[in-house]
Curated annotation (Swiss-Prot):
Pfam families: Queuosine_synth. This is S-adenosylmethionine:tRNA ribosyltransferase-isomerase. Pathway: tRNA modification; tRNA-queuosine biosynthesis. It catalyses: 7-aminomethyl-7-carbaguanosine(34) in tRNA + S-adenosyl-L-methionine = epoxyqueuosine(34) in tRNA + adenine + L-methionine + 2 H(+). One of its GO terms (cellular component) is cytoplasm. The gene is queA. Belongs to the QueA family.
């Protein structure tokens, strides 16, 4: 875990100073095509404007890129209430959040619209004959419901579910289109309900160029939850950070630890990768294994593992804006966002990217 001298009141002040108003037309509704033709702002002592496909020119052969290889699941499902004596059958929107292994087998947390009380039965899919039965068995503090299925629902989600998209994306295209577009090219382990979007800029061709120049690759898994979109409302100290599951294999933990010991740069692809690395860091090495993290990185927190961070442009008032301010410094982030606003960068999940250097001294 990272060292922290973070003062919540200071974080409140930083968040207020970093506030910005964003015109709606600057929110990217589709990604660049090809993916690596998005813009890349390089933020260090100076700000430079490049294209994402220029990344090989900005990295060193000794660098280690660390990716989050979690895969977005089709977690948005339409369900119906059972028909009893000719009544019922109403539609319920279900957003599956994650499997709650500590509660029991085949239990998921989910947001329901409209919400249902414990004891209610739902059928996910077309109808009761072909659908999948779930019972509401509990209510969580944030309003999510616990659903217990009769069987493992995961193998059926590709058939009955749709990909969940951020609330600021107007999904005009087909679900099949989004299943390709809102997924990194290296996604592997299913479990996220939001994409680790910094990785959306990579193409197989760009990865091959990085391999050819000797940049090493490692990966971690952090299943991104819907809480990633939750804004900070009120004092930072009162914000309840969402829990997310992560895993680092023995091989990848060893590769990252070795890079740190050899003084090579670790380049985190995305804030989810930063949160995983900092959660698994014990002060001397990255620990292999699986766990759950609620890590909240705010100004005053010393980020230990990554030296560079590839990330998109985040929402005002968000935990991610505080994370990048902790990583690169408030002044640099303020200058970077001012530049992004004045130079027509595209924001949020499908927008342009930044390459941030870690601030090593105050």
């Amino acid at each position: 875990m990272p060292d922290s001298t973070a003062d919540p009141s200071t974080a409140d002040e930083v968040l207020a100073r970093l506030h910005f108003d964003l015109p709606e037309d600057r929110i990217a509704q589709t990604g660049a095509e090809p993916r690596d033709t998005s813009r890349l702002m390089v933020v260090g002592e100076q700000i430079k404007h490049r294209m994402f496909r220029d990344l090989p020119d900005l990295l060193r052969p000794s660098d280690l890129l660390v990716f989050n290889e979690s895969r977005v699941i089709p977690a948005r499902v339409l369900a119906r209430k059972p028909v009893v004596n000719g009544f019922g059958g109403g539609q319920v929107e279900v957003l599956l959040l994650r499997e709650e292994f500590d509660v029991g087998a085949n239990v998921w947390s989910a947001y329901l619209k409209p919400a249902k009380r414990a004891g209610h039965e739902l059928w996910l899919g077309e109808n009761e004959a072909t659908g999948h039965r779930a019972e509401v068995v509990g209510v969580l503090d944030d309003g999510a419901r616990l659903l217990r299925f009769d069987h493992d629902i995961k193998p059926h989600l590709d058939e009955i579910g749709r990909l969940p998209l951020p609330p600021y994306i107007n999904a005009g295209d087909s679900d099949e289109t989004w299943r390709e577009r809102y997924q990194t090219v290296y996604a592997k382990t299913p479990g996220s309900v939001a994409a680790p979007t910094a990785g959306l800029h990579f193409t197989p061709e760009l990865l091959a160029r990085l391999d050819e120049m000797g940049v090493e690759r490692a990966s971690v898994t952090l299943h991104v939850g819907a809480g990633t979109f939750k804004p900070i409302q009120g004092p930072v100290a009162d914000h309840v950070m969402h829990a997310e599951r992560y895993e680092v294999s023995e091989t990848n933990a060893a590769a990252i630890t070795r890079a740190k010991a050899e003084g090579r740069r670790v380049v985190a692809v995305g804030t989810t990768t930063v949160r995983t690395l900092e959660s698994a860091w014990d002060g001397a090495a990255v620990r292999a294994g699986a766990g759950e993290t609620r890590i909240f990185i705010t100004p005053g927190t010393r980020v230990e593992v990554p030296d560079l961070l590839i990330t998109n442009l985040h929402l005002p008032g968000s935990t991610l804006l505080l994370l990048v301010a902790a990583f690169a410094g408030e002044d640099r982030i303020r200058a970077a966002y001012d530049a992004a606003l004045s130079q027509d960068y595209r924001f949020y999940s499908l927008g342009d990217a930044m390459l941030l250097e870690r601030l090593t001294s105050a």
